[in-house]
Amino acid sequence: MGSLYSEYLNPNKVQEHYNYTKETLETQETTSRQVASAFIVILCCAIVVENLLVLIAVARNSKFHSAMYLFLGNLAASDLLAGVAFVANTLLSGSVTLRLTPVQWFAREGSAFITLSASVFSLLAIAIERHVAIAKVKLYGSDKSCRMLLLIGASWLISLVLGGLPILGWNCLGHLEACSTVLPLYAKHYVLCVVTIFSIILLAIVALYVRIYCVVRSSHADMAAPQTLALLKTVTIVLGVFIVCWLPAFSILLLDYACPVHSCPILYKAHYFFAVSTLNSLLNPVIYTWRSRDLRREVLRPLQCWRPGVGVQGRRRGGTPGHHLLPLRSSSSLERGMHMPTSPTFLEGNTVV
């Protein structure tokens, strides 16, 4: 074990693994690569900004301090950190990669794994919360804070453990034949483990939302039609974006596990597949703010404050620009559902699932 960790600071180890798994090493910065890197950095900056706006909205408005919005804030935080990690990953790629020590390489890839997996686990936590809120016709009892902290803490703890396993020893240093082609210092079995866990999470989210659909459809027959339509619309968007963004990355990692070294040239283009998965962090805040009118209004408020002489509703107002903003009305179905004996109503424009 000591000899394994002694290799972590070896400056030649990363190049050794890349020479073994890659047919050619891209050590020169071409124009196309520079353009692609610039585009990814701009995309990640957009991820950071929009998720930061969601976090500001949740933090500044006490109405959003309920369980559902706190989970959305946790999702926004993980997506924001994913954007930051992917910027660092991009800037430390290319010719810079071969100058990294193994511990630096593990930190680069591990940070991306931790934040992206935290985003996935946050989606699972939201699905669990929605199932508890709807299936049991009860948002939370006296254990509200405990349950929220448990779900949020568990999502980050599992993400840290999952992303930190390679630097703790589950890697292929000293065993080149066991190395991944896409991630040359990661063991293929670790890659398979990650894909399996994410696939199980996807199935769990699907199962929870199917359960929610069944509960909503089987109760309150007089309101089942509008509830079902709105719920199905939200679930279709959430699961559709999740699958579209993550399926390419899952597929390339499964192919990586199955292919012997140098036998699948498509693996050398894996960075494009991971770039697609990053879009999930870009689209998550768009989806959830679009489906919640109050959250959308609060997220856009800082942007409206920068427009001279324009109030919350976009009308020309007197006085100092950006001041004396109108208070938000409580129109969220989630908030109304807390005081009703029935499950929350999923109405267009107000729904959060």
UniProtKB/Swiss-Prot annotation:
Q: Which residues are glycosylated?
A: N19
List the stretches on the Cytoplasmic face of the membrane: 60-66, 129-147, 211-233, 293-353
List membrane-spanning regions. 35-59, 67-95, 110-128, 148-173, 190-210, 234-255, 272-292
Q: What are the UniProt keywords, alphabetically?
A: Cell membrane, Deafness, Disease variant, G-protein coupled receptor, Glycoprotein, Lipoprotein, Membrane, Non-syndromic deafness, Palmitate, Receptor, Transducer, Transmembrane, Transmembrane helix
Q: Which disease is it linked to?
A: Deafness, autosomal recessive, 68: A form of non-syndromic sensorineural hearing loss. Sensorineural deafness results from damage to the neural receptors of the inner ear, the nerve pathways to the brain, or the area of the brain that receives sound information.
| Extracellular-side positions | 1-34, 96-109, 174-189, 256-271
Q: Predominant location of this chain?
A: membrane
User: What GO terms fall under cellular component here?
Assistant: cytoplasm; glutamatergic synapse; plasma membrane; postsynapse; presynapse
The record's comment on protein family reads: Belongs to the G-protein coupled receptor 1 family.
Q: Tell me which residues bear the S-palmitoyl cysteine lipid modification.
A: C305
Protein function: Receptor for the lysosphingolipid sphingosine 1-phosphate (S1P). S1P is a bioactive lysophospholipid that elicits diverse physiological effects on most types of cells and tissues. When expressed in rat HTC4 hepatoma cells, is capable of mediating S1P-induced cell proliferation and suppression of apoptosis. Receptor for the chemokine-like protein FAM19A5. Mediates the inhibitory effect of FAM19A5 on vascular smooth muscle cell proliferation and migration.
One GO BP annotation of this record: positive regulation of peptidyl-threonine phosphorylation
A GO MF term: G protein-coupled receptor binding
Q: Report which superkingdom the organism of origin falls in.
A: Eukaryota
The organism encoding this protein is Homo sapiens
Which PANTHER family has this protein been placed in? G-PROTEIN COUPLED RECEPTOR (PTHR22750)
Subcellular location per UniProt equals: Cell membrane
Its placement in the membrane is given as: Multi-pass membrane protein
Q: Which Pfam families match?
A: 7tm_1 (PF00001)
Q: What is this protein called?
A: Sphingosine 1-phosphate receptor 2
